[in-house]
C-alpha cells in the first residue's frame, strides 16, 4: 500500500507584543499523530527560522510543548538526531547562576544578557508520552529555561533590569516607526 507523501509546514511565529505570548500553556494529554505532525512542523519552523528553541505558544498553540536543537560545537550545524522534543516539562533541580546573552524568535533582532541557572534537570514526556528526565548544563540549560518561560507566558525581556527594559521598549518603538515609514 502506498501512503501519500507527508508535507511539512512552516508555522508563523508570533512577535512581541502579541498578547497570546503572555498566555499560560496547558499540559498535553493526547499523544497521537496530530501531536507528531505538529512537532514535525515546529522543527521545520525552527530550522527555517535559524533558531535553537521554539515553544508551541510562539506559533499560537497554548500547550506545554517545546523543542530545542543546539548546534554542535565542532561544526556549528544542527542535526535532527540532536533534536529534543519536550512535552509537559517540570524542573527538578536548578543550580549555579550564570549570565547568558539571549535572543528570541518572537523578539527579533534584540539580544541581552539574562541571569539563568547554569545546571538544570527536568522531568518531561517525549512525543509518545514516555516519561523522561534530562540533566542539562550551559547553553542547553539556558535554552530549556528560556523555552519553559514561554510556556508560562514569560519572555526574556521581562527578566531585564528596568533600565535595560526601557532601552528595549525604546528600540521597539523606533523599529515600529521605521517599518511604518
From Swiss-Prot:
Pfam families xref list: Pep_deformylase (PF01327)
Cofactor binding remark: Binds 1 Fe(2+) ion.
Catalytic residues of the enzyme: 147
Cofactors that this protein relies on: Fe(2+)
Positions with a binding annotation for Fe cation: 104, 146, 150
Enzyme class, broadest EC rank: hydrolase
Entry's Gene Ontology BP terms: co-translational protein modification; translation
Gene Ontology molecular function, alphabetical: metal ion binding; peptide deformylase activity
Keywords: Hydrolase, Iron, Metal-binding, Protein biosynthesis
Catalytic reaction annotation: N-terminal N-formyl-L-methionyl-[peptide] + H2O = N-terminal L-methionyl-[peptide] + formate
EC annotation from Swiss-Prot or TrEMBL: 3.5.1.88
Function: Removes the formyl group from the N-terminal Met of newly synthesized proteins. Requires at least a dipeptide for an efficient rate of reaction. N-terminal L-methionine is a prerequisite for activity but the enzyme has broad specificity at other positions.
HAMAP family named among the record's database cross-references: Pep_deformylase
Entry's family note: Belongs to the polypeptide deformylase family.
Name of protein: Peptide deformylase
The organism of origin for this protein: Helicobacter hepaticus (strain ATCC 51449 / 3B1)
Name of the gene: def
